């Protein structure tokens, strides 16, 4: 009888155990896309859930076109902060839109506002007992005429690295890893990682498409796998639970 009670208690506690939420915040390179069965564009965080066991729930809160500034000013961060609980994770990848210097609603100086917005995400995540993880922006497909992949993000990745170092934040250098990915595919084949279509090649588009920033399903899946592999390499006790939940 005693053994039966123990078994019932174990089953009950397992069924009602609180799951860990992995929040992903950032821009269109991460964000969920409408009509995913037809739409060839995918964000890498959109395809992240299948890499984890069911005890990790990915809440992809990345939104097209957002910078750290607009994400905060639109109260998107506030809504996440209110829900954060001890043991959760927040993956933070911004930069693409922070560099939009012609747009006052989005632009941030990498050495001031961008840096302090990242620090805010980190400190407020920790206030809730959750773990922040900083990621640099994914590389754009930007090969020159000699086949050299030219960086496009200015000092934003540098500031992300510096904040991670100074505040001892688990860190994934996604810019570096995706540069390696782009280079491994080369100037022509790397189009497969992005959105390159002629009229009639894809029913979702009614005209030519040549987008070297956003991702195809292949590109998104490759980068999600890169993120998973990078998580495994992080030497920080705070991510052990996440590591153990990888399939």
Locate the predicted segments by residue.
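Glycine-centered flexibility sites
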Residues: 26, 43, 62-65, 95, ...
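Short, flexible micro-motifs
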Residues: 29, 46, 65-68, 90, ...
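Alpha-helical cap/lid subdomain in secreted, periplasmic
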Residues: 75-221, 225-246
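Serine-esterase "nucleophile elbow" of acetyl-processing enzymes
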Residues: 15-62, 78-88
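Bacterial Sec-dependent N-terminal signal peptides
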Residues: 1-19
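Acidic/histidine-rich helix-loop elements
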Residues: 31-41, 62-71, 100-110
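Flexible, active-site-adjacent loop/turn segments at secondary-structure boundaries
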Residues: 28, 42, 69, 154, ...
């Amino acid at each position: 009888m005693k053994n039966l009670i123990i078994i019932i208690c174990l089953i009950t506690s397992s069924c009602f155990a609180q799951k860990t939420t992995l929040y992903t915040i950032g821009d269109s390179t991460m964000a969920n896309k409408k009509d995913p069965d037809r739409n060839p564009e995918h964000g890498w965080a959109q395809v992240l859930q299948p890499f984890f066991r069911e005890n990790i729930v990915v809440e992809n809160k990345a939104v097209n076109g957002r910078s750290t500034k607009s994400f905060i000013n639109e109260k998107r961060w506030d809504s996440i902060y209110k829900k954060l609980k001890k043991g959760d994770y927040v993956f933070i990848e911004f930069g693409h839109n922070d560099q939009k210097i012609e747009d006052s609603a989005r632009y941030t100086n990498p050495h001031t506002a961008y840096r302090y917005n990242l620090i805010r995400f980190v400190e407020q995540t920790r206030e809730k007992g959750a773990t922040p993880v900083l990621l640099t922006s994914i590389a754009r497909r930007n090969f020159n005429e000699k086949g050299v992949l030219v960086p496009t993000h200015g000092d934003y990745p540098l500031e992300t690295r510096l904040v991670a170092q100074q505040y001892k934040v688990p860190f994934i250098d996604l810019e570096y890893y995706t540069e390696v990915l782009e280079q491994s595919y080369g100037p022509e084949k790397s189009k497969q990682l992005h959105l390159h279509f002629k009229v009639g090649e894809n029913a979702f588009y009614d005209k030519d498409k040549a987008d070297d920033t956003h991702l195809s399903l292949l590109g998104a899946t490759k980068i999600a796998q890169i993120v998973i592999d990078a998580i495994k390499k992080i030497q920080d006790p705070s991510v052990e639970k996440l590591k153990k939940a990888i399939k």
